[in-house]
Amino acid sequence: MSSSSTNNTDPHIAVLAFPFGTHAAPLLNIIHRLATASPKTHFSFFNTSTSNTKIFPTSKHGGELLNVKAYDVWNGVSEGYVQVGKPQEDIELFVKAAPESFRMGIKAAVAELGREVSCLVSDAFFWFAAEMAEEMGVPWVPFWTAGPHSLSAHVHTELIRETIGVGGSFLIY
């Protein structure tokens, strides 16, 4: 979608996806629903190339909707890097690079569209997205892709630790 076919005052929503597991697909699903309901709103969907290729219906990441565009961000793995085999290494590398990768992606989308971001939507555990939204002066909408039980566990982590214990002092049944 070129900037010539858009109105610079229409909303521009930046969406930050977590590319691992099943996080990105449900987020894209809700974005597609919002894009259908609000055709003048542009949604810039930031994700890794690998994940975008898997979840978008076309190989060019354009999707079916003209107001949703995928942008590829860096996965955090430098060229020539040899992974050491830690189970979560790819996730750790991505999360370390994500804040700057997303900032660069947003900057490119704003330049391409000629529209500033008016709202930031992200996977809920991207803590840095709140800071990014504050820096941009826009609302942040964290989206929880998992079920309510895991959210409850995260919200009540301290209570669980106080009740059950951590380290060497575990509650034994």
Per-range role (PLM):
Residues 1-173:
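Glycosyltransferase specificity loop/lid
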